[in-house]
Design a protein with these regions (language model features):
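Extended, low-complexity, turn-rich repeat/linker tracts enriched in Gly/Pro/Ser/Thr and Asp/Glu
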Residues: 112-115, 124-132
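GGW-centered surface loops in extracellular recognition modules
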Residues: 37-57
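Bacterial Sec-dependent N-terminal signal peptides
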Residues: 5, 15-42
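Sec-dependent signal peptide recognition
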Residues: 2-8
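Conserved Ser/Thr-centered positions that define the repeating blades of beta-propeller domains
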Residues: 137-141
Length: 214
């Protein structure tokens, strides 16, 4: 009888551990933390606290999908992060530092099984004279061509002015049905204005993509 009870206990502990590993980080509460739109699911999240430039996969990806980023222009490293858009259970830690000369940063984030996706992240430039102060946001639904349709229709903009203090940036792709349930969805951030020098950088932290499960 005691052996049977021990066996059952071990099974329950193992099952609980597996469920915990599959659960997404909860949205935080308090200053600077993330508040997902009602009904949204966190799909991908990068906090860069592991400081591993070779690990391009998201710190969290919804089970069954994998988010990755790619930056090939210059080199990247890490520095002190931001408390904007934090996910509960993490701290400001480190952020991704994209160094000049910079071109673009691409986040591949399949939306298979989801729609109404929203991208949110914190960013700052290293100074007003070095480090890109203008970012242009485009996205692809076919894995080849990058467009701005969902961001610029109805008078919207796909450009962001970047300051020297971390700001929060949000881009909503819900108006383009081709983004929904799309394994080829990716977002490109193209740098301009003070991005061609040999010094300076832009810093990204707490990047999240949320969506509604279909």
């Amino acid at each position: 009888m005691k052996k049977n009870l021990l066996f059952i206990t071990l099974i329950l502990i193992t099952a609980a551990s597996c469920v915990k590993d599959r659960n997404p980080p909860a949205a935080g509460t308090g200053g600077g933390t993330q508040n997902l739109p009602s009904g949204d699911t966190l799909m991908y999240y990068w906090n860069f606290n592991n400081q591993d430039s070779s690990a391009r996969t998201a710190d969290y990806s919804v089970p069954g999908l994998t988010g990755m980023y790619n930056y090939s222009a210059s080199y990247i490293d890490f520095t002190g992060g931001s408390n904007l858009n934090l996910i509960n259970g993490t701290d400001s830690g480190q952020c991704l530092r994209v160094r000049n000369p910079s071109q673009d940063l691409i986040f591949s984030m399949p939306t298979t099984g989801y729609d109404s996706v929203v991208l949110t992240y914190a960013e700052e430039a290293s100074s007003t004279t070095s480090g890109s102060t203008i970012n242009t946001i485009t996205y692809t639904t076919d894995g080849v061509n990058y467009i701005s349709t969902a961001l610029t229709n109805n008078g919207g903009s796909n450009q962001a002015s970047i300051g020297i203090v971390f700001g929060l940036y949000t881009f909503n792709f819900s108006s383009d049905p081709n983004v929904n349930n799309n394994p080829k969805f990716a977002v490109k951030i193209t740098f301009s204005n003070n991005n061609t020098g040999t010094s300076g950088n832009d810093r990204f932290d707490n990047i999240s993509l949320s969506g509604v499960r279909q």
